[in-house]
């Protein structure tokens, strides 16, 4: 009884594989009719794909067989229907590349055209804005750098003093809070 169930489930998968092969053959024929790819017989392609499916089900592959092969060997090992589709896709990609190159050329020409139109306007803008006008303020970079260094030294000294004062103030604040009740706690801002 288990054999009849296994055979029943195997038949739909074989039918599905045959249908997939037929679809691939039909797609290859469409491509060939459009002049998109060169390839072998679609009948031999479908029989090849059925044979490959049967071999894969019967024999498990060793790790060496699963290793990636060089690209040419991989393409040669594909069924004819797949090869036809790959070639058709390559040709379509070349067509897309040609269209994209044409677009880029036209886009560059359009940019150049409008840059030429903008040149007089940009010249007028430059004329109106002109060069920087002189002013009474002078930049004294050396003196500012010296002042900055002195200011930074003063800040570091103040920060060290504040760090020493903070722990003492916190300890005094917690001691005062313990002595007083919860209602006597007044924020520091309110005391000032």
From Swiss-Prot:
Belongs to the nucleosome assembly protein (NAP) family. Residues 177-192 have a biased composition (Basic and acidic residues). It comes from Bos taurus (Bovine). Residues 140-168 have a biased composition (Acidic residues). The gene is NAP1L5. Residues 1-12 have a biased composition (Polar residues). It holds the Pfam family NAP. Residues 15-28, 40-55 have a biased composition (Low complexity). This is Nucleosome assembly protein 1-like 5. Residues 1-76, 136-192 are annotated as: Disordered. Residues 86-112 form a coiled coil. It is found in: Nucleus. The lineage of its organism: Eukaryota, Metazoa, Chordata, Craniata, Vertebrata. PANTHER family: TESTIS-SPECIFIC Y-ENCODED PROTEIN. Keywords: Coiled coil, Nucleus. It comes from the Eukaryota. Gene3D superfamilies: 1.20.5.1500. GO terms for biological process: nucleosome assembly. One of its GO terms (cellular component) is nucleus.
């Amino acid at each position: 009884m288990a054999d009849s169930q296994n055979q029943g489930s195997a038949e739909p998968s074989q039918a599905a594989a045959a249908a997939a092969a037929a679809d691939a053959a039909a797609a290859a024929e469409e491509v060939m009719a459009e002049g998109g790819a060169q390839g072998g017989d679609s009948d031999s392609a479908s029989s090849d794909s059925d044979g490959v499916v049967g071999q894969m089900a019967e024999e498990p592959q060793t790790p060496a067989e699963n290793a990636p092969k060089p690209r040419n060997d991989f393409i040669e090992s594909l069924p004819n229907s797949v090869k036809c589709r790959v070639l058709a896709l390559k040709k379509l990609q070349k067509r897309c590349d040609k269209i994209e190159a044409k677009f880029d050329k036209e886009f560059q020409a359009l940019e150049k055209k409008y840059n030429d139109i903008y040149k007089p306007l940009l010249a007028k803008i430059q004329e109106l804005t002109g060069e920087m006008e002189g002013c009474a303020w002078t930049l004294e970079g050396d003196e500012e750098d010296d002042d900055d260094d002195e200011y930074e030294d003063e800040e570091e000294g103040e920060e060290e003093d504040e760090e020493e004062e903070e722990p003492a103030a916190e300890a005094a604040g917690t001691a005062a809070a313990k002595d007083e009740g919860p209602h006597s706690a007044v924020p520091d801002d309110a005391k000032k």
